[in-house]
Swiss-Prot record:
Its EC number is 6.2.1.26. One of its GO terms (molecular function) is ATP binding. It holds the Pfam family AMP-binding_C. This is 2-succinylbenzoate--CoA ligase. Converts 2-succinylbenzoate (OSB) to 2-succinylbenzoyl-CoA (OSB-CoA). Pathway: Quinol/quinone metabolism; 1,4-dihydroxy-2-naphthoate biosynthesis; 1,4-dihydroxy-2-naphthoate from chorismate: step 5/7; Quinol/quinone metabolism; menaquinone biosynthesis. The gene is menE. The lineage of its organism: Bacteria, Bacillati, Bacillota, Bacilli, Bacillales. Belongs to the ATP-dependent AMP-binding enzyme family. MenE subfamily. Transmembrane segments: none annotated.
Amino acid sequence: METMPNWLMQRAFLTPDRTAIEIEEEKVTFVQLHEKVVSVCEHLTHVGVKRAQKVAVLMKNGMEMITVIHALSYIGAVAVLLNTRLSREELLWQMDDAEVVCLVTDQEFETENVPVCSFAEVMQGPKAEAFIQEEFSLEEAMTIIYTSGTTGKPKGVILTYGNHWASAVGSSLNLGLRDDDCWLACMPMFHVGGLSLLMKNIMYGMRILLVPKYDANFIHKALQTRGVTIISVVSKMLTDLLERLGEGTYPSSLRCMLLGGGPAPKPLLETCVEKGIPVYQTYGMTETSSQICTLTADYMLTKVGSAGKPLFQCQLRIEKDGVVVPPRAEGEIVVKGPNVTGGYFNREDATHEAIRNGWLHTGDLGYLDEEGFLYVLDRRSDLIISGGENIYPAQIEEVLLSHPAVVEAGVVGMADESWGQVPAAFVVKSGDVTEEEIIRFCEEKLAKYKVPKKACFLEELPRNASKKLLRRELRKLVEEM
């Protein structure tokens, strides 16, 4: 059984006085963070948290959540990270599914299903001597994070210490490390993209500027004034920042904007190229502990729209009906690597369906070019099949977003008696534009069968906490038409 020293303890020993976390005006060094975590361990031990138990965490981004996540790893308990935007029923379902022994939260939450530990009350209560893991076994589960459930019930993705370690190592081999690196963290830590930054923070000894709640104005200013070198974003966040940037650009010290969350519209990427903003388009998911494929800035100009090549320890191929297809042929993206989950909690059927011979079948569609660069087309479940033709919503959204009066766009399939399905578009507009003009604009740029048959205007598009588009909500709107 392969082990490593407890990551935060080791970091506090190696670089105790280096800044670990900045939140607003508060700065915490690695040794101070370790001391805070030990204190949380002792309080959690008093309320009965033990090694190997599963503990639900329902908290917002902040020092409290950081210390709880680390404290559970110190104790050897498994952190089940819950999305704060879910309904009460959804949260209860996930806690029941994960078989948690208690819930640690910074919010009002009452239930008889599971003991609820208010973080503030726990910290005001007594302490008990805690047995702290000085070593981590890389094979043991560290976290369970539920997939967003874009199709069917969410599944609890088990990520081991080894998965998180491999993810951080793979990222560093790809993006490089600098002594002055500071990663601005604005993604929720209950999602793997946000959580992965906590892992990088202690493994790299890198400063994190944590934004408790998404605030585009604060982030825009911080990129200019707080020495930020790296930031993780999705397309919506990047669009918000570019709006605020206007004709300007960001300091050269900002060396990487890691762009994930699904295929990015080309007009957005081209704007970044024009402004010299170093966007690294990336592809990953909960099951891969964050990114598994990234396009470095070297190829920003020549491979616009690509998610790049696999991280150093990872492999990727495209399959159709179980057969690896040649370059440019579309199929399912299949990946393998030490950062890839071994399976879903209590879901052997789903695990066997998704992971075959060590390869994870992602359910995403894409192709590789002749040089091995990945182009992500869409989720297989989002595919619109119209009269036997495959239509990728992301392609139509890209066209819609190139219209000067469109700021957001989402496309889903709509039932049609003749064709089975036809595209329907949902648009957030910034100026005067009609449904007819939108459809006419698409007719000039798309094959006839890809042109939306309806274009509906919304004040905003439904998105999850990571700002990813929720197509299932758009499908509900279509059904109500």
